[in-house]
């Protein structure tokens, strides 16, 4: 079993309201990026449904230098529909509720893990909101 010390949250960096599926992300990661598998463990759709992308026993490909000991949660969205991919918190109410659900579950499985946004490790806006609004779940 992998030692998990971080939960790292991401956005798909797609315009507000545009749905992306696990298959879409997998195609981008595997076909376009030539990765061995999809990078995220979980993807939260616009309707708040949580989709398993990658077994937690397998390291993701989502945050250079931190993949080995982390779980990746990603939500669909994160950019304004302005044609410029401007970072924006586009979470739907359903996605916000889904974050509470999945982060609560992950904290129960990995009580020593800390919560982070991708932007804490890379020069990015991802996940386009302050993930630490959910820190109360990790107390």
Regions found by a protein language model. Give the residues of each.
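Short, conserved "active-site rim" segments that organize catalytic pockets and cofactor/ligand binding
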Residues: 1-58
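Intrinsically disordered, low-complexity segments enriched in small/polar residues
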Residues: 27, 38-40, 73, 108, ...
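Short, well-ordered helical secondary-structure segments
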Residues: 31, 60, 102-104
């Amino acid at each position: 079993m992998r030692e998990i010390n971080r939960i790292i949250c991401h956005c798909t960096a797609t315009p507000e309201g545009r749905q992306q599926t696990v298959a879409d992300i997998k195609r981008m990661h595997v076909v376009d990026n030539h990765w061995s598998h999809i990078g995220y463990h979980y993807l939260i759709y616009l309707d708040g449904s949580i989709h398993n992308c990658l077994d937690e026993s397998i390291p993701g490909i989502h945050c250079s230098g931190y993949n080995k000991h982390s779980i990746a949660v990603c939500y669909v969205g994160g950019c304004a529909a302005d044609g410029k991919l401007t970072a924006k918190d586009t979470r739907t109410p359903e996605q916000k509720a889904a974050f509470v659900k999945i982060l609560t579950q992950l904290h129960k499985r990995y009580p020593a893990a800390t919560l982070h946004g991708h932007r804490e490790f890379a020069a990015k806006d991802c996940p386009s909101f302050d993930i630490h609004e959910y820190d109360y779940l990790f107390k």
